[in-house]
Amino acid sequence: MAAGDFRLCDVVLDDTIGRSTPDVEHERAVAIFDLIEENSFAPIGHAGGPYRLNISLVDSKLVFAIRTEEGIDVATHILSLTPFRRIVKDYFMICESYYEAIRSATPSRIEAIDMGRRGIHNEGSQTLKDRLTGKIEVDFDTARRLFTLVCVLYWRG
């Protein structure tokens, strides 16, 4: 373990929920790949990683179980899904519109929907970043990728 190595080296989503649509699974795979490639993840009060993160849903709560690269428990944080419900619902609705639009809409219509989708995604990312304050310090790009994974879990759950 390198002191000060505040990053994720592995991310696993709860497999007990099952798989989703190919589009959602693609989003999951891309988010995990991008997250591992570039992230800033610092559990408050821990000397450094890298870290393994297991994300799951338990009793309608979001669970972040953090371990070191060697598998030593660091912390488990349980967050209420309530602050995310409306954002995730809106995000899924606009994603459906986006996937429909890319099949038949004009480029300007697709761009407008995509801007809305990104705006809602940013709102969810900021909400997650805020909810992690005092528990895990993450930058905005890391929060964005983590929010994508929260959406995947929510969709499958």
UniProtKB/Swiss-Prot annotation:
InterPro entries with a match to the protein in the record: UCP032146
Family label: Belongs to the UPF0262 family.
Identification of the protein by name: UPF0262 protein Rleg2_0240
Annotated source species: Rhizobium leguminosarum bv. trifolii (strain WSM2304)
